[in-house]
Regions:
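Aromatic/hydrophobic pocket-lining residues that form π-stacking "cages" and hydrophobic walls in ligand
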Residues: 28, 32, 52, 76, ...
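Rossmann-fold dehydrogenase core element
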Residues: 109, 124-165
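Glycine-rich cofactor phosphate-binding loops and adjacent beta1-alpha1 units
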Residues: 11-13, 54-135
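Residues in the short beta-alpha loop(s) of Rossmann-like NAD(P)-binding domains
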Residues: 49, 116, 143
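Residue-level signal for nonpolar/aromatic packing positions in well-ordered secondary structure
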Residues: 4, 36, 56, 100, ...
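Structural detector of well-ordered beta-strand residues that form the stable sheet scaffold
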Residues: 20, 44, 109-111, 138, ...
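Mid-domain Rossmann-like dinucleotide-binding core that forms the NAD(H)/NADP(H) cofactor-binding site
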Residues: 1-69
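C-terminal hydrophobic helical "lid"/dimerization subdomain
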Residues: 98, 145-196
Length: 196
């Protein structure tokens, strides 16, 4: 929850804003959906795995968009009413960053947190679009010790309202390799935890 907590602050995400989360079914993505819902935003989950959509809807998304669909761009514009106020990209591949930037509305903010599949992904953003729409592009990495403490306090205060990290799979050391493989291949919705 600490990283999504930081993203809310860094992105100046406010109640009733239209927010898209790319990689919404992933470990950080699903936590971001929960935080954006807690912040009273209109939330769209974007993912390539439709099997994760039910969990996305259950944990904060109002709508889900299949990033592999031929009409993904139109679906994003429809979901946002013409453009998002903030897009949070946990994938940060060339394709996702360009799709995210294209779906921003005037004054929109793009926050990138992913490693582009382990690569240094480049993406194109038209200078006139950046100027005319007054788009902001921000990187965000990790969270501070203070943000961890603040997010833990928030979870303690809001746990009864569903603001808890979503752990969908646990294992001891004997299943560690299987969990690592499933995380690496995006087969886990939410988080996996090692139980000692």
């Amino acid at each position: 929850i600490a990283t999504p907590y930081k993203v809310l602050r860094r992105g100046r995400i406010a109640p009733l804003e239209r927010v898209a989360v790319f990689g919404g079914g992933g470990g950080l993505g699903i936590q971001m959906l929960k935080m954006a819902r807690w912040a009273n935003c209109h939330v769209t989950a974007v993912d390539v795995d439709k099997s994760k959509f039910a969990a996305c809807l259950e944990h904060g998304a109002d709508i889900c968009v299949d990033a592999t669909s031929n009409n993904a761009h139109e679906a994003l514009l429809d979901a946002s009413g013409g453009g998002f106020d903030a897009v949070i990209d946990f994938v940060s591949s060339t394709k996702s960053l360009e799709m995210a930037a294209d779906s921003l509305g005037t004054g929109g903010r793009l926050l990138t947190l992913g490693g582009g599949g382990g690569s240094n992904a480049d993406f194109k953003l038209n200078a006139m679009t950046l100027l005319n729409k007054e788009i902001e592009v921000m990187g965000s990495r990790y969270c501070s010790y203070q943000e961890v403490l603040e997010s833990l306090q928030l979870v303690g205060e809001q746990a009864d309202k569903g603001l808890m990290p979503l752990v969908t799979r646990t294992s001891g050391f004997d299943g560690l390799e299987d969990i690592h493989n499933d995380v690496e291949h995006s087969r886990i919705t939410g988080r996996a935890a090692l139980v000692l």
